[in-house]
């Protein structure tokens, strides 16, 4: 089944560029978002987020009739869910937006459709999404029920783009494709190859989910090492910048530069998804989060102390 109409649910900093990328390849794309202002803005050929080069692509796509936005899902050949996945309580992942998105598209699902979850999610989220869909559509079959013969194909395909470079990295970067079956993976790869110049690397859904969490946890741990060094060096009266410069002269050492914590949204959130599911095993990942979460407070305390010394003088 070819992909004539593609629906992207969630028109934020990942969803809208993804919708625009498909539309730029002359696919009919329907973006869905609960934010009426975002929908109205997009339908005027404008954008409600800041991202270089995105505005021109959206404007052209809307003017040529390949992109429109709505607040309610409609019939499509493929659905991509790109909604927020924050954490709640004691840093447990909150899947309420994914659940709402899945249940909103369930009534318009048809045989042969492909549903892809792009939102950063805990391991097992794709299977849970498939369960929600199956509960609402008992007239259709799903991969967890009949495997490769399912009426609806489901996959997890996380984004890995840098804000400010999204329109380049969305197309150039390799993509991890985690289908619930090999058929699901093949169809998801076919979909992304509409605009992708990078490689589709195929695995299963659970590994793909863990891959995205691992990428950001790896970065978080490395940042935490540099930040912890800065705390130690401050206590020991050592210049941390000189220390790192010297240590990095070792051919197999590449320590990052310390800072006031971590930037962006993902790195400060995603590692907690691993910790929440594996509290006994993820001790290093938890500690890295605690180090980086505490660094801004340490910086503030240092600034206060410096200001106090100046005022005292």
Predicted regions and their residues:
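Structural/interface elements that position substrates and couple domains in central-metabolism enzymes
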Residues: 1-313
């Amino acid at each position: 089944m070819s992909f004539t109409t593609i629906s992207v649910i969630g028109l934020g900093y990942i969803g809208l560029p993804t919708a625009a990328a498909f539309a730029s390849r002359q696919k009919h794309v329907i973006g869905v978002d609960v934010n009426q202002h975002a929908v109205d803005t997009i339908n005027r050929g404008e954008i409600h987020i800041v991202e270089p080069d995105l505005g021109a692509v959206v404007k052209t796509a809307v003017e040529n009739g390949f992109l429109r936005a709505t607040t309610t899902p409609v019939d499509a050949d493929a659905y991509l869910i790109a909604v927020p996945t924050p954490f709640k309580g004691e840093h447990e992942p909150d899947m309420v937006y994914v659940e709402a998105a899945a249940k909103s598209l369930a009534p318009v699902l048809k045989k042969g459709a492909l549903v892809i979850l792009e939102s950063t999610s805990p391991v097992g989220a794709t299977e849970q999404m498939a369960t929600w869909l199956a509960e609402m559509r008992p007239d259709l079959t799903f991969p967890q029920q009949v495997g490769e013969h399912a009426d609806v194909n489901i996959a997890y395909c996380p984004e890995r783009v840098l804000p400010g470079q999204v329109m380049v990295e969305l197309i150039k970067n390799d993509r991890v494709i985690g289908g619930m079956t090999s058929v699901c993976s093949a169809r998801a790869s076919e979909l992304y190859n509409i605009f992708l110049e990078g490689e589709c690397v195929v695995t299963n859904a659970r590994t793909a989910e863990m891959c995205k969490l691992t990428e950001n946890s790896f970065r978080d741990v490395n940042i935490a090492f540099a930040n912890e060094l800065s705390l130690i060096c401050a206590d020991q009266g050592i210049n941390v910048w000189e220390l790192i410069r010297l240590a990095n002269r070792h051919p197999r050492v590449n320590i990052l530069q310390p800072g006031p914590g971590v930037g962006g949204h993902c790195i400060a959130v995603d590692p907690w998804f691993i910790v929440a599911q594996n509290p006994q095993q993820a001790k290093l990942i938890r500690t890295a989060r605690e180090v980086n979460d505490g660094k801004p407070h340490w910086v503030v305390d240092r600034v206060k102390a410096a200001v106090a010394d100046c005022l005292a003088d």
